[in-house]
A protein has these predicted regions:
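Amphipathic alpha-helical repeat scaffolds
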Residues: 231, 274, 303-307, 322
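Short inter-helical turns and helix N-cap capping residues of alpha-solenoid HEAT/ARM repeat scaffolds
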Residues: 298, 328-330
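Alpha-helical adaptor scaffolds
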Residues: 264-299, 306
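A beta-strand-loop signature enriched in Asp, Gly, Thr, and Trp
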Residues: 212-228, 244-279
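Structural detector for internal amphipathic alpha-helices that build alpha-solenoid repeat scaffolds
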Residues: 302-313, 334-345
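Iron-sulfur cluster-binding cysteine motifs and their immediate structural context
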Residues: 18-21, 188-212, 218, 232-258, ...
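Amphipathic alpha-helical scaffolding segments comprising HEAT/armadillo-like alpha-solenoid repeats
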Residues: 283-287, 314-326, 345-352
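Auxiliary alpha/beta "docking" domains used to position bulky ligands
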Residues: 1-182, 221, 230
Length: 352
């Protein structure tokens, strides 16, 4: 016999915490409350090259559409290290691919739920992998509020956590949504953005965001933003790292799978950039197998690496960039030429 919705929800939460999730909440399915905002955001072109967001827009507007028959969503959060220092690679991508880590645990939760229910439970897991508005689910499940930097902020964890959802065909008691926005008058995230990517509080123009430019954008990084990229090779944590909620409540990384991988650990921006520029396709696949960084592909990471070396401005990096002028990807050659120009305009290296 299946437990009552309230009892089953409590059992699910206990099991999810036991699997290592840091946050768990439950919500019902229906029209997404943020759908109008999402549509307006798309209409302004703020999604840039992320055409998949437009293609899945209809399903994102109603949380019942992605997985017909589902009536409840179990929403989870998993910390990825709010106290770690900033670096050339965004915190979320330094370890194993979060999609793999989260999905495996949600699948385990699904399997346990079927045993607990005593019947087959139709369910589907989403970890940034399908047409759902994860933040909408999470706020409705009581996990946090939308910060001015557009990230979901939890009062006990900050914002450095992944969001996942398991949609199921079971009626569960829903948690109260998080109704109070607690950013107050703080605007640190808006002011700290290197490219002024926030149109207004809570609205991000992705085409100006360093995370978008170094990961999602497949073409050239516009000249107006290259210097602002600085030594950020993949992604950007600036708007989160300055947030007082992360300063006060950000937690240390406990998940072994999210510890920095060998290809990243202990390497500064210059070292990592030179190594990436020198990689052929086989070396790239070996180094970034099972990493979220593979999303940018070799050409994207090499493009970023050239920009980073140009911004660092060390003349000893010129040989690596000269070699990159013969790179098999034209976009890398172009950015390498730009980087050499940046370095050489500072004059010849000082000989001691």
């Amino acid at each position: 016999m299946i437990a009552a919705p309230a009892d089953l929800a409590s059992l699910i939460k206990a099991q999810a915490y036991g699997l290592g999730f840091d946050l768990v909440g439950v919500t019902t399915l229906g029209p997404a409350e943020t759908a109008p905002d999402f549509d307006e955001w798309l209409s302004h072109g703020y999604a840039g090259e992320m055409d998949y967001l437009q293609r899945g827009a209809e399903k994102r507007r109603d949380t019942r559409l992605p997985f017909p028959g589902a009536v409840s969503a179990i929403v989870v959060g998993l910390n990825y290290g709010g106290t770690a220092p900033n670096g050339p690679v965004a915190r979320y991508a330094r370890g194993d691919d979060y999609h793999d880590v989260m999905c495996k645990r949600l699948e385990s939760l699904h399997g346990w739920l079927e045993q607990e229910a005593g019947r087959a439970v139709r369910g589907k897991s989403y970890v940034d992998t399908g047409p759902i508005l994860e933040r909408d689910f999470a706020r409705r499940a009581g996990l946090g509020w939308f910060g001015k930097n557009t990230n979901l902020i939890n009062p006990d964890l900050g914002s450095f956590f992944f969001i996942g959802a398991l949609l199921v065909d079971l009626e569960l008691e829903a948690d109260a949504p998080f109704e109070v926005e607690r950013c107050g008058s703080c605007t640190r995230c808006l002011e700290a953005c290197p490219t002024s990517a926030f149109v207004e509080p809570g609205v991000l123009d992705a085409t100006r965001c360093i995370s978008y430019l170094t990961i999602e954008a497949k073409g050239e990084i516009p000249g107006e933003f290259r210097e602002a990229v600085g030594d950020l090779l993949y992604g950007c944590d600036v708007c989160q790292s300055v947030c007082p909620w992360n300063a006060r409540f950000g937690q240390e990384l406990r998940e072994a799978g999210f510890q920095p991988r060998e290809a990243i650990a202990g390497r500064d921006a210059r070292t990592l950039a030179r190594e990436i520029l020198a990689m052929d396709e086989a070396a790239f696949r070996t180094s970034f197998k099972g990493s979220a960084m593979k999303r940018a592909k070799r050409r994207g990471l090499a493009r970023n690496a050239a920009v980073v070396l140009g911004n660092v401005g060390d003349h000893t990096d010129e040989p690596a960039l000269v070699v990159a002028l013969e790179h098999d990807e034209g976009i890398v050659r172009e950015h390498a030429a730009w980087a050499l120009g940046q370095i050489r305009r500072t004059g010849p290296p000082t000989l001691e």
